[in-house]
């Protein structure tokens, strides 16, 4: 498939989405937060359907639009409930008026968490991710896997640990459930995938589960471990998609796992890069991905949340299977026709 995305709208949409995320992250008010969220989402709807001549891209954009609109409605309803219970939309004023025994406001928190869980594709609000990742241009998929997730996780931290830190007993188990479900489902669902972008979609769901595990603890160590994890995950994703964008032959991109067959024989440097990246994503020491998971598990075990740690370890073992399967295809399967080597300098530098 030939991806014709070099149009003037493309950078404008990317910048509009980033602007919305910056507004969302820096907001101290529910209304401003919602406006930033919608500015981000409107740009992402168009980016998802940028290859409008292809059925998969149009389907992905429509599915993302419908489900995102539903989640935004639930999130706005949660904001209205919180305003109704507290009389304010300012985070600081909300925090000053709350007590730890105000259970009624939990309904508002739940609705907002549902909306945010959709944005980071946490289970069970992940339905859009595989189709959108596969149907979007590869560079847009890279954007989806990195920037919106960082913004949404930052909002998770600001939202839960500023106005609602006193209500940790009400929202902690919600995050624990989202974390466990995401880690297990993402790891298991990725096993049967043949498309690299769908595999990364399910893999990202699993990785978000680890980041949520850090946030669910309710301590500074948990927040720090979550931030470290998502930072390392972003770097690994950038490297993986750089390799994916280099899989081009005669102006056509290839994105199936079988297209990596025997890659080491024709492209040894790219194969070595993928080896390091996939080992790191699998959490194999002494690479960065291992330390990312180590800090998460350390913070979880220190708070005696042993079941969460056991589920995380089990998910890591399951996920290692499909990462190692890709490495086996790269190094031990028969080689295919060589890919182009005239890549942009920026792509080579990012790798």
What are the roles of these predicted feature ranges?
Residues 1-351:
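Alpha-helical transmembrane segments of multi-pass membrane proteins predominantly involved
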């Amino acid at each position: 498939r030939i991806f014709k995305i070099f149009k003037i709208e493309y950078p404008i949409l990317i910048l509009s989405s980033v602007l919305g995320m910056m507004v969302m992250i820096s907001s101290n008010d529910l209304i401003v937060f919602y406006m930033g969220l919608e500015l981000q989402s409107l740009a992402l709807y168009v980016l998802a359907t940028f290859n409008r001549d292809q059925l998969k891209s149009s389907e992905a954009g429509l599915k993302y639009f419908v489900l995102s609109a539903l989640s935004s409605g639930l999130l706005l309803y949660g904001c209205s409930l919180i305003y109704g219970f507290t009389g304010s939309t300012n985070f600081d004023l909300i925090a000053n008026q709350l007590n730890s025994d105000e259970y009624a406001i939990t309904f508002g928190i739940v609705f907002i968490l549902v909306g945010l869980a959709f944005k980071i594709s946490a289970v069970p609000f992940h339905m859009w991710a595989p189709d959108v990742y596969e149907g979007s241009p590869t560079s847009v998929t890279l954007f989806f896997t990195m920037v919106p997730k960082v913004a949404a996780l930052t909002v998770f931290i600001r939202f839960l640990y500023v106005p609602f830190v006193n209500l940790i007993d009400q929202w902690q188990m919600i995050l624990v459930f989202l974390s466990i479900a995401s880690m297990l489902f993402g790891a298991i669902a990725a096993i049967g995938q043949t498309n690299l972008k769908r595999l990364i979609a399910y893999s990202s769901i699993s990785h978000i589960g680890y980041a949520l595990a850090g946030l669910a603890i309710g301590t500074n160590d948990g927040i720090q471990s979550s931030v470290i994890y998502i930072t390392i995950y972003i770097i690994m994703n950038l490297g993986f998609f750089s390799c994916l964008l280099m899989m081009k032959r005669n102006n056509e991109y290839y994105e199936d796992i079988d297209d990596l067959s025997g890659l080491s024989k024709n492209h040894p440097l790219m194969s070595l890069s993928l080896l390091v990246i996939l080992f790191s994503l699998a959490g194999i020491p002494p690479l960065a991905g291992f330390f990312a998971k180590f800090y998460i598990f350390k913070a979880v075990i220190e708070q005696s949340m042993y079941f969460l740690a056991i589920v995380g370890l089990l998910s890591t073992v399951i996920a290692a299977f499909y990462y190692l399967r890709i490495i086996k295809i790269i190094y031990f399967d028969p080689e295919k026709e060589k890919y182009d080597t005239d890549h942009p300098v920026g792509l080579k530098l990012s790798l």
